[in-house]
């Protein structure tokens, strides 16, 4: 509704007599006086009022409105409007979103680079777009950037460009920005030396670091970050970077409490089956130091690759299985994941997981969310699971194909029973038929 009002206002401004010069001889003196008064009215609006309106306008509408009068053009260049900007770069023949115009990019670099604090680059799947993003990045030498995000909308295009070119551009920002607090550089060729430069210049300010799928970063590289960035509160990385030493560094008494630790567990090498294990003492140290930390784990492994995990107590809170997971692994969760809050299982094959699900409900007392797809659970067992969890189960997403009717309960009856225990209306999800 607000957007509609603003768009309407913009149209009024662009078509108003305030922005059209009257043609001599066509208007009466009274009309000309009225138009001059209108022009004065628009131009005399306080800066703070125009600034408030501009903050809600898309950039293209803001630029059009800035041509109304000189004062509005002055507001257009106020630094507060240029704290945050997302550069969109693509190849028009293969992308679905509009690219930031080159003239605008140059104007931002020349006039507003010093004002930029929250900068992101959204690129398509082409190497050319990634290289263009790095070209802009290398020119941000006079900015005080606090947040940096590199986003690939399709395949990780930053990984297809020259590693030296990428690292060089990133290093420029790391050296010139002394107050970086949040960095998202996932799926990029960042390496250990560039992280060392980041630490040397921003160790006191860094709070969030997301760098999953960065194959050129070693466990030693991320350990260096944890050792020196004592204010780090959020960290996202791949499992191969995780080590006992890293967890102990994050548990140091001089380190602030960690709030969010995301771990992506993927096969780094084709045919890899064995993964290193993390000692329970290391996990215990982390939880003792940061009792409220969310430990999020995404698994993209095959069943035979998961033998290492959940043999001992693991403080995971949010657990996502992107591929098929065995009954044995699900059985371990109830024994060794007492902090589990959310569980999503994308597939389990044709094995019924009644007992495993009920055991999870009995032992994982903090569970509030469950998602199941391509699994098999009897209706009776599912109702028992919901009964054990009760109303604390705030998110329940189950595909209808998962539920197997039995002698006690049918699909037509299950929503009534489940709704009763949840305290709200609930139905299983249904795959749409197109």
Curated annotation (Swiss-Prot):
Cross-referenced SMART domains: FBOX (SM00256), LRR_CC (SM00367)
Expression tissues: Expressed in the adenohypophysis, hypothalamus (especially in the suprachiasmatic nucleus or nuclei, SCN) and pineal, all neuroendocrine structures associated with timing and homeostasis.
Xref: PROSITE patterns: FBOX (PS50181)
Entry superkingdom: Eukaryota
Cellular component GO terms held in the UniProt record: cytosol; nucleus; SCF ubiquitin ligase complex
Span of domain F-box: 39-85
GO biological process: entrainment of circadian clock by photoperiod; protein ubiquitination; rhythmic process
InterPro entries, A to Z: F-box-like_dom_sf (IPR036047), F-box_dom (IPR001810), Leu-rich_rpt_Cys-con_subtyp (IPR006553), LRR_dom_sf (IPR032675)
Listed pathway(s): Protein modification; protein ubiquitination
Location in or out of the cell: Cytoplasm, Cytosol; Nucleus
Keyword ATP-binding part of the UniProt annotation: no
Main location: cytoplasm
UniProt keyword terms in alphabetical order: Biological rhythms, Cytoplasm, Leucine-rich repeat, Nucleus, Repeat, Ubl conjugation pathway
Residue ranges of LRR repeats: 140-165, 187-213, 214-239, 242-265, 322-347, 349-374, 375-400
Primary role: Substrate-recognition component of the SCF(FBXL21) E3 ubiquitin ligase complex involved in circadian rhythm function. Plays a key role in the maintenance of both the speed and the robustness of the circadian clock oscillation. The SCF(FBXL21) complex mainly acts in the cytosol and mediates ubiquitination of CRY proteins (CRY1 and CRY2), leading to CRY proteins stabilization. The SCF(FBXL21) complex counteracts the activity of the SCF(FBXL3) complex and protects CRY proteins from degradation.
Matches recorded under PANTHER family: F-BOX/TPR REPEAT PROTEIN POF3 (PTHR16134), F-BOX_LRR-REPEAT PROTEIN 21-RELATED (PTHR16134:SF2)
Assembly notes: Part of the SCF (SKP1-CUL1-F-box) E3 ubiquitin-protein ligase complex SCF(FBXL21) composed of CUL1, SKP1, RBX1 and FBXL21. Interacts with CRY2. Interacts with CRY1.
Name of the protein in its database record: F-box/LRR-repeat protein 21
Organism expressing this protein natively: Ovis aries
Highest classification ranks of the organism: Eukaryota, Metazoa, Chordata, Craniata, Vertebrata
């Amino acid at each position: 509704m607000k957007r509609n009002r603003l768009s309407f206002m913009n149209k009024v401004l662009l078509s108003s007599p305030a922005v059209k010069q009257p043609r001599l001889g066509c208007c009466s003196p009274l009309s000309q006086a009225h138009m001059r008064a209108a022009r004065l009215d628009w131009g005399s609006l306080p800066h703070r009022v125009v600034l408030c309106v501009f903050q809600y306008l898309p950039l293209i509408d803001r630029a059009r409105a800035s041509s109304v009068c000189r004062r509005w053009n002055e507001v257009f260049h106020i630094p507060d409007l240029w704290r945050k900007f997302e550069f969109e770069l693509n190849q028009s023949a293969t992308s679905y979103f509009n690219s930031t115009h080159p003239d605008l990019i140059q104007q931002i670099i020349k006039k507003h680079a010093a004002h930029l604090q929250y900068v992101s680059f959204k690129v398509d799947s082409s190497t050319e777009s990634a290289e263009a993003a790095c070209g802009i990045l290398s020119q941000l030498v006079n900015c005080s950037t606090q947040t940096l995000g590199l986003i690939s909308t399709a395949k990780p295009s930053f990984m297809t460009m020259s590693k030296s070119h990428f690292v060089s551009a990133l290093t420029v920002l790391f050296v010139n920005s002394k107050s970086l607090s949040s960095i998202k550089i996932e799926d990029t060729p960042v390496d250990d030396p560039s992280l060392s430069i980041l630490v040397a210049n921003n160790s006191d300010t860094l709070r969030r670091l997301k760098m999953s799928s960065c194959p050129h970063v070693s466990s030693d590289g991320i350990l260096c970050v944890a050792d020196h960035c004592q204010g780090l509160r959020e960290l996202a990385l791949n499992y191969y970077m995780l080590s006992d030493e890293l967890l102990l560094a994050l548990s140091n008494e001089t380190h602030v409490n960690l709030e969010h630790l995301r771990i992506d567990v993927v096969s780094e090498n084709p045919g890899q089956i064995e993964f290193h294990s993390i000692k329970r003492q290391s996990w215990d140290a982390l939880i003792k130091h940061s009792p409220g930390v969310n430990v999020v784990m995404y698994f993209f492994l095959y069943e035979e690759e998961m033998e290492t995990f959940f043999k001992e107590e693991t403080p995971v809170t949010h657990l996502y299985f992107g591929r098929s997971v065995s009954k044995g692994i699900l059985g371990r969760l109830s024994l060794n994941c007492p902090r589990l809050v959310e569980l999503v299982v994308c597939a389990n094959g044709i094995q019924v997981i009644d007992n495993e699900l009920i055991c999870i409900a009995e032992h994982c007392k903090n569970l509030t969310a469950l998602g199941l797809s391509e699994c098999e659970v009897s209706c009776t067992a599912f109702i028992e699971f919901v009964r054990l969890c009760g109303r604390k189960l705030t998110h329940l997403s189950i595909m209808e194909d998962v539920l197997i009717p039995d002698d006690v309960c049918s699909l037509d009856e299950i929503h009534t029973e489940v709704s009763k225990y949840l305290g709200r209306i609930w139905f299983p999800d249904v795959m749409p038929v197109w």
